């Protein structure tokens, strides 16, 4: 008898399960199922044909791949979650009976979830874990600012606080920071760790405001925090050992004191004070700077290669960036956010301090004469020292992004600051702000100004070459004119002898005249004509080329090609909108300036 093929028993109909079916198969509640999927990295799938995958149902449901659910069935944590469900029921029963002794015993025996094997499973190599540090550090820095709540306990916040401080200390010791940026969301930092770029966000410190459950589900965030704390512990241990630092690090101040847990100001002060202290090394081996110097010496061998030359220039620029603030001492006023500035200054070799009467961890006083810069964010100061520069905080961020110490005249107290440009913009961006373009041009001009003598000598050589070229052109024109006049004169003088010559010499003279005429034609100067392109025809040709290019794309790549075209159109549209908006702003500013000038003139004439 032939086996009958039933509907939805093969193909997409048999490959997907709904969330309800998956929970029934795993015998877990909704909360435990979400927690398990977060820990294992399992996410819902989007099928190609939803109607077939949902077995004819028209409702939009959350679907999971059948292989993913089978993969979760073999996870040992599933048994722990089932045991927890039983323990929760028993603890609730003991609490209802009023038997506190039995309740405490069951709470002490509450099963714990171990995530070590999941970390090894999801990140087989250390580089894989580094690639996932972006979300990890962003979430840990966010949780470190939370107070103790019902869902987010004090243990989680203190652990996030400790791990984030350890990671910042590694960036300081290895000088791994590369880019910084300030926005309304917080402080953006980018570090280079083991050849991988890690970007994370540190939020601004504002008083905590409770959020509604519809907006933020702290239970889901807690599941991510549990996973990322274990992951960050492994990563920090490996990073500290790679640069010969003792782990766990010993800080001069306690990060888990009772006062810091109850008082937010004390917590922030102790956290920043920990950043301003050096860590203990496991041995006195050479630092990474010596290794970089050895690599630079090896690159000196092949100076003809353009790639090697570029690598050497990048290495030299990176070494300068690592020691950007070396030898400089900064005093931070109390109105300035200290943690991001202390972190940046310490990463690039600078020394920072603040008022020791207000915050702990200060290393020198404001009256120290060796202070080179004082960071101020107020319109004026009653007392100022001549031996130091008073700058606004943006100067620190712009210096790091430009990889050089910028002039302080644009960042003085009360000055209108230049635009704070993002260093994360790509070079192939369609729209480039005018300020960024001017800044790029200014960098080139400054580079030329630093090499003043070379630029002057190059200009002199160019002027000499131009003079020689002009003289050569003048000599050629003069020779052409002389040759032309000689040809005309010789033609007028040869008319008389031609009548007296015999008929035998006539062919030779004809050949000579033909050659002269050909020379004249070759030496003739013809005025050029400007070719005007028709924009409509040019647009038509480009459309035809695009259509031809689209026909040449293979059928399996046409969907990807359409997505690429849609993305390009979207980027072009956004760039055009930004350009129009910029033109409107510039026009408005020009009108305001003209109106201001008119009012000033009227006031002067009225006087």
Curated annotation (Swiss-Prot):
Alphabetical UniProt keywords: Nucleus, Ribosome biogenesis, rRNA processing
Q: Where in the cell is it found?
A: Nucleus, Nucleolus; Nucleus, Nucleoplasm
Q: Which domain of life is it from?
A: Eukaryota
- Compositional bias (Acidic residues) at which positions? 495-511
Any one biological process term the GO annotation gives: maturation of 5.8S rRNA from tricistronic rRNA transcript (SSU-rRNA, 5.8S rRNA, LSU-rRNA)
Report the PROSITE patterns cross-referenced here.
BRCT
**A Pfam family for this UniProt protein?**
Pescadillo_N
Function, as annotated, reads: Required for maturation of ribosomal RNAs and formation of the large ribosomal subunit.
Name of this protein: Pescadillo homolog
Source organism per UniProt: Culex quinquefasciatus
